[in-house]
UniProtKB/Swiss-Prot annotation:
Coiled-coil intervals: none
Name of this chain's protein: Large ribosomal subunit protein bL21
Record-level Gene Ontology MF annotations: rRNA binding; structural constituent of ribosome
Cited function: This protein binds to 23S rRNA in the presence of protein L20.
Upper classification of the organism: Bacteria, Pseudomonadati, Pseudomonadota, Gammaproteobacteria, Lysobacterales
A cellular component term, taken from the record's GO annotations: cytoplasm
């Protein structure tokens, strides 16, 4: 069974036992979280579609909180000896899907 859930403005296709990195959530490491905004459920019987399916939920365990690798940004103007360097590290929450109900 798999599901498509929405969190942090992004959609993720998940199955039980998968590990993934999502946008940072303010939760404790080791705690259980529940996602209610499910767009699609699929299994061998077929597919259920809808905007926020009623009764569908995905539960996950929080494995860690961290920061991704640095993304480097360079802006420059040709022939003008002007260059601006910048870097950014995005915060993330790593989760493991423990159950899909629906």
């Amino acid at each position: 069974m798999y599901a498509v859930l929405v969190t942090g403005g992004k959609q993720y296709r998940v199955a039980q036992g998968e590990k993934l990195r999502i946008e940072k959530l303010e939760v404790e490491v080791g705690s259980e979280i529940k996602f209610d905004n499910i767009l699609m459920l699929g299994d061998s019987d077929g597919v259920k579609l809808g905007d926020a399916l009623k009764g569908a939920a995905v539960t996950a365990k929080v494995l860690s909180q961290g920061r991704a690798d640095k993304v480097r940004i360079i802006k420059f103007r040709r022939r003008k000896h002007h260059m601006k360097r910048q870097g950014h590290r995005q915060y993330y929450t790593e989760i493991e899907i423990t159950g899909i109900a629906g």
